[in-house]
Amino acid sequence: MRLREFTALSSLLFSLLLLSASAEQCGSQAGGARCASGLCCSKFGWCGNTNDYCGPGNCQSQCPGGPTPPGGGDLGSIISSSMFDQMLKHRNDNACQGKGFYSYNAFINAARSFPGFGTSGDTTARKREIAAFFAQTSHETTGGWATAPDGPYAWGYCWLREQGSPGDYCTPSGQWPCAPGRKYFGRGPIQISHNYNYGPCGRAIGVDLLNNPDLVATDPVISFKSALWFWMTPQSPKPSCHDVIIGRWQPSSADRAANRLPGFGVITNIINGGLECGRGTDSRVQDRIGFYRRYCSILGVSPGDNLDCGNQRSFGNGLLVDTM
């Protein structure tokens, strides 16, 4: 009897160990978690450093970049402090809620946690990624208007917290439970919202954002990290914004049938396609494009093709369900 009990117990322990060892480690399968020690995250959610993890078509995040352009692979060789100030010219205007918050140093420090950002591909791809990232986040935080000084596209990063009277944005969840008294309205460059986004974002960057969501609006580095996390993280069936802009994403037959072709327009679709795409001309989409064209001009790169999403079918609701 005791032998049978011991055998059964051993079998149970082995099964539990096997189950724990089989849990996915990273990416969309693990709530946006990242691999340690510079490992790649495979499309199946596992960490490793071989072609099965890092190769084209096998890697979903933390993938190796393309050739490093002359001048160094670091982000500062693409966007300098003076360029940052030129792009976000009025972010420190007295009328802006975010005055003094968004800094170049905070951006660079945050980007170090996402080594593929702005460092993947050739110089054109890298510049377009910087332009696209700041265009989309500038739209989310814009304080500009049609007749604003220096034009409407010089007023990105004006706002820090969602305007109006936002609710708590709490959706019941066993995995990402809302903390008592906390609200998960839009904050930071990408205006991240909802507990089911704050939770995995915090887990990925190593901060408890479910209990401390306002860190996104009080710590500039965490604020930029929240936007970069969204940018770099795919959420099936959507690719990551990063993979689209550097040319890694290749549309499926279903994507092509939906007119989702590589370019800036697909990124808008990823972010807020449920509300903005497939509707013909949309002022919000045009605002995003306006920022993108301006930033491409400052960085000295062409914007590429397929900037609009007016004729694209939506992927569905974006991670950011309510955006400007």
UniProtKB/Swiss-Prot annotation:
Its EC number is 3.2.1.14. Residues 24-65 form the Chitin-binding type-1 domain. Keywords: Carbohydrate metabolism, Chitin degradation, Chitin-binding, Disulfide bond, Glycosidase, Hydrolase, Hydroxylation, Hypersensitive response, Pathogenesis-related protein, Plant defense, Polysaccharide degradation, Signal, Vacuole. SMART domains: ChtBD1. GO terms for molecular function: chitin binding; chitinase activity; endochitinase activity. It is found in: Vacuole. It comes from the Eukaryota. The modification 4-hydroxyproline is found at P67, P69. It catalyses: Random endo-hydrolysis of N-acetyl-beta-D-glucosaminide (1->4)-beta-linkages in chitin and chitodextrins. Induction: By ethylene. The active site is at E140. One of its GO terms (cellular component) is vacuole. GO terms for biological process: cell wall macromolecule catabolic process; chitin catabolic process; plant-type hypersensitive response; polysaccharide catabolic process. It is an enzyme of class 3 (hydrolase). The 4-hydroxyproline residues are not glycosylated in this plant vacuolar protein. Disulfide bonds join C26-C41, C35-C47, C40-C54, C59-C63, C96-C158, C170-C178, C277-C309. The keyword Nucleotide-binding does not apply. Its main location: other. Belongs to the glycosyl hydrolase 19 family. Chitinase class I subfamily. Defense against chitin-containing fungal pathogens. PANTHER family: CHITINASE-RELATED (PTHR22595), ENDOCHITINASE A (PTHR22595:SF184). This is Endochitinase B.
